Amino acid sequence: MKLTLNRILFSGLALSILLTLTGCVGRDAHGNPKGMIWEFLGKPMSYFIDYFANNAGLGYGLAIIIVTIIVRTLILPLGLYQSWKASYQSEKMAFLKPVFEPINKRIKQANSQEEKMAAQTELMAAQRAHGINPLGGIGCLPLLIQMPFFSAMYFAAQYTKGVSTSTFMGIDLGSRSLVLTAIIAALYFFQSWLSMMAVSEEQREQMKTMMYTMPIMMIFMSFSLPAGVGLYWLVGGFFSIIQQLITTYLLKPRLHKQIKEEYAKNPPKAYQSTSSRKDVTPSQNMEQANLPKKIKSNRNAGKQRKR
């Protein structure tokens, strides 16, 4: 449940960043794009689309595909680094499950909100002690670096002159395409399925809804926009599959082996909570407070006996 919640939160974060960046590309009074992202990234991409389409004679459809491939190839290392960090944290969590299991049981069996919060605080402390990032190791910096490129390419495919009046393999790039939308949905569904194959059965059950979230979102976005933009999402789908294949079959096995060797040399130890040291009952406090009085009364009784 926690992993699913983290994915939902970061999906919302990614969508929010995308909406923010798209707001940077507006239109002037003549309908032309403007904004910082467009000037520094979108306009050069639009130039290369026009170059491949007209100077190289490849047409706008193939030009969009080529420029998208170039852009996605350049930022692929950032995506792989992000996947590596998330996979590293996931593998560590799997190895440390026996360490965290007693605390998780206390969270589930808590009889009050105070007990639950105390156990959750202890779980976070135990995770920090073992080098676990509660957010799954998904850093915001790689995402922030990638989003301007995604946004710029998105608008370059939409606003480049000549795209809306061109065709590609019988598809009108200026209109919506049901065929292209179906292909895009299939690609992102396959990518979601691949990501589920890389996790345990327990996590797979929790991620079932996420398997359909991305394809449904892509259907909505692709069918509500011209096919020229759909080509951008199409190429992006292939790159998402490539990134997931590299993560599942190259990165995760290596990380699994690496972490297994690390914990074989230094086995993880059970987390020792310090809260129990502060657990002093009221009766003990009263006894300690009354101890000087008892000693004093005993001394007085001894003096009276001597007299």
Curated annotation (Swiss-Prot):
Keywords: Cell membrane, Chaperone, Lipoprotein, Membrane, Palmitate, Protein transport, Signal, Transmembrane, Transmembrane helix, Transport. Residues 293-307 have a biased composition (Basic residues). InterPro entries: YidC/ALB3/OXA1/COX18, YidC/Oxa/ALB_C, YidC/YidC1/YidC2_Firmicutes, YidC_ALB_C. GO terms for biological process: protein insertion into membrane; protein transport. PROSITE patterns: PROKAR_LIPOPROTEIN (PS51257). The keyword Transmembrane helix applies. Residues 1-23 form the signal peptide. Residues 271-288 have a biased composition (Polar residues). Residues 263-307 are annotated as: Disordered. HAMAP family: YidC_type2 (MF_01811). This is Membrane protein insertase YidC 2. It comes from Streptococcus pyogenes serotype M1. The lineage of its organism: Bacteria, Bacillati, Bacillota, Bacilli, Lactobacillales.
